[in-house]
Design a protein with these regions (language model features):
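N-terminal, positively charged nucleic-acid-binding surface of large information/translation enzymes
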Residues: 2-182
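Structured secondary-structure scaffolds
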Residues: 2-49, 101-105, 156-366, 370, ...
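Short, glycine/acidic-enriched loop or turn micro-motifs at the edges of active sites
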Residues: 55, 232, 530
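Helix-rich, typically C-terminal accessory recognition domains appended to large enzymatic cores
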Residues: 121, 332, 341-376, 380-471, ...
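Hydrophobic, well-ordered secondary-structure elements that form the walls
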Residues: 266, 295, 400, 428, ...
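Beta-strand segments within the central parallel beta-sheet cores of soluble alpha/beta enzyme folds
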Residues: 284-287, 451, 539
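Intrinsic disorder at enzyme termini
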Residues: 447-514
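Phosphate-backbone binding interfaces of nucleic-acid-interacting proteins
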Residues: 496-616
């Protein structure tokens, strides 16, 4: 009997002749996120993924490559394992349908279902697509072609064994009715129910037209149909053959994460097979949407397939993982945009999260901290727990970033860089601990880095307890801002050359879009203060219209305080904040500097204009 403190999550098994891409990555990262979250909850977790290696399509591909099918697939598997490693995916087993234990499981299952009378011999005649390894009806075709591959359909008639799928129509409908969360999202549940209500045809489960597969135990001339073979992997992976403690511990699966294109097989055929075996169906089938690229379907002809290396080269592994689940409501179709990924990396990860970590770790290193009342995390944690249970992964991130926003507002209101209040600094450090733990299923690498800076473990114990007072060192930059993929990929090459090429004394040109990113405004210096231990810096309070900024400026050698107060100036306002001599500087005052650096003159508007006016 499965216990509540166990969690079993699976992906579909992937066709090995494909290249791992954003679609398969999305499914597998989703399963990894759920596995990691449940591990934090102290559950014993089993996460299964793998490859589907039998069938006519593989047999033909192996023939083209002049290799035996097993040798052919053996050479393909490393690219999947390498891809998942690059994405920090931590599975328990990578199952292959060519594994010896799986082939045994399939034959045992076939024998059991056959003995029950749910398999019979007949003839199958239909319209077959080798690419899909599936039959279609006339009405499902598009101009006589496969609706998926758009290739001509092959008319086949062959001896076949059939599974009595039609026998289980009422069982399925009753199960859907009693378990409304079995198929998610809900719109897909209604699609399946409507199709099942129309009636079910018995399923052809064997072929004689190819030899690469698992023979039927009761007729060696027939090879098991690939989907009947593939679905059984969910049982093999946790020890069905031995009916081991592992199997008893984890079955039924908590959730099969799949793409919407294979929902029928998982929500109809699979539970019917399990009914025949007297096994309970999985608790949930979650069918997510498809990814397009800049509004277009991914295809080799368009050369727009986002493979794993391209995905992580844009802004790094954690930014890619974050983007996929922040950008799209989990379950819906999504559109991949490199531009939007970079915007989210810069605006949300670098500006909001990265700056908070940098600012607070610097304050903690400079002033230390003193235990105080933590910033309230319990309401957020309660919502996050429920959203994880509902598989609303995008909303989990929304909640976490709402909390990050509230921490940034708290810091802005309390101004610990001015007050040096150790209790405020502690409250922020404690909040960062909570943020890192909640983000860890999505961004494991980043969370681990944060945990090392603030000295805590990624665990439920750390989440439920306040941060221990300890020495903290300033965090390294977690998210380097980027403009283009080329700039990011070639950053190491650029370090070896002159970073600021000079032509006739002028730096190399920038794109107009880069200029548009700058927010430069007219400001008025309202107050000038000394900074302890600073020989060159003044602390300036500058009005830029609707708000005031604290800016540190190296003007002490060139201006008296009285010369600066009341003076209009030009301020670069969207420069990332940084700590200077223990003071957070929130922008930059622009000045002209002579070549010998003996003269520094503040740039001011020629005529009077209101504070906050934009420089264009």
């Amino acid at each position: 009997m499965k216990k509540k403190n166990n969690f079993y999550v699976t992906t579909p098994i992937y066709y090995p002749n494909d290249i791992p891409h954003i679609g398969s990555a999305y499914t597998t990262i989703a399963a990894d996120i759920l596995a990691r979250w449940n591990k934090i909850q102290k559950k014993e977790v089993f996460f299964l993924t793998g490859t589907d290696e039998h069938g006519k399509k593989i047999e033909l591909a192996a023939q083209d490559a002049k290799k035996k099918p097993k040798t052919f697939v053996d050479n393909l598997i490393p690219k999947f394992k390498e891809a998942w490693k690059k994405l920090n995916i931590n599975y328990n087993r990578f199952i292959r349908t060519t594994d010896a234990d799986h082939e045994q499981v399939v034959q045992v299952i076939l024998s059991e279902v056959h003995k029950k009378g749910d398999i019979y011999e007949g003839y199958y005649e239909g319209l077959y697509c080798t690419g899909c390894e599936a039959y279609y009806t006339e009405k499902e075709l598009l101009e006589g072609c496969c609706p998926v591959h758009k290739t001509p359909i092959e008319k086949l008639k062959e001896e076949s064994y059939f599974f009595r799928l039609s026998k289980y129509k009422e069982n399925l409908l009753n199960y859907y009715d009693k378990n409304p969360d079995f198929i998610s999202p809900s719109n897909r549940r209604f699609e399946i129910i409507n199709r099942v209500n129309e009636g079910l045809q018995d399923l052809s489960i064997s072929r004689t037209s190819f030899s690469w597969g698992i023979p039927l135990p009761f007729d060696k001339n027939h090879i098991c149909y690939v989907w009947f073979d593939a679905l059984a992997n969910y049982l093999t992976g946790i020890g069905y053959l031995e009916h081991s403690k592992e199997f008893q511990k984890f079955w039924p699966a908590d959730v099969h994460i799949i793409g919407k294109d294979i929902l029928w097989f998982h929500a109809v055929i699979w539970p019917a097979i399990l009914f025949s075996l007297n096994l309970e169906p999985p608790k949930k089938i979650f069918a997510h949407g498809w990814w397009t690229v800049e509004g277009q379907k991914m295809s080799k002809s368009l050369k727009n397939i986002i493979n794993i290396d391209k995905l992580i080269s844009i802004a790094g592994v954690d930014s890619a993982r974050y983007f996929l689940f922040r950008e799209v409501s989990f379950g819906e179709d999504g559109d991949f945009s490199e531009k939007i990924l970079i915007e989210r990396h810069n605006n949300e990860l670098a500006n909001k999260l990265g700056n908070l970590i940098s600012r607070v770790s610097t304050l903690a290193e400079t002033y230390g901290m003193e235990k105080s009342t933590p910033i309230k995390i319990k309401p957020t944690l309660k919502k996050v727990n429920q959203l994880f249970q509902n598989l609303e992964l995008d909303k989990v991130l929304n909640e976490i970033f709402s909390f990050i926003d509230s921490c940034n507002i708290y810091a802005q209101e309390k101004k610990p860089w001015e007050t040096k209040n150790k209790k405020v600094i502690y409250s922020l450090c404690n909040a960062i601990k909570d943020i890192a733990i909640l983000l860890s299923p999505f961004m494991p690498e980043t969370s681990e880095k944060i945990s090392k800076v603030f000295n805590f473990e990624i665990s439920i114990e750390s989440l439920n307890n306040d941060l221990k007072i300890n020495k903290i060192k300033k965090s390294p930059i977690l998210f380097k801002k980027i403009n283009t993929i080329a700039e990011n990929v070639n950053s190491k090459k650029k370090e070896k050359v002159n970073k600021s090429p000079i032509i006739d004394g002028i730096m190399s040109s920038i794109e107009f879009k880069d200029w548009e990113k700058l927010d430069i405004r007219v400001g008025k210096i309202e107050k000038v203060e000394e900074i302890d231990g600073a020989d060159k810096l003044y602390k300036l309070s500058i009005s830029v219209g609707a708000e005031k900024r604290t800016i540190c400026a190296g003007l002490k050698k060139y201006y008296k305080k009285s010369e600066l107060e009341g003076k209009k100036c030009i301020v670069f306002v969207n420069l990332a904040p940084r700590i200077m001599k223990g003071v957070e500087s929130q922008g930059m005052l622009l000045a002209a500097v002579s070549q010998d650096e003996k003269k520094v003159i503040i740039i001011s508007p020629e005529k009077d204009i209101e504070e906050g006016a934009k420089i264009r």
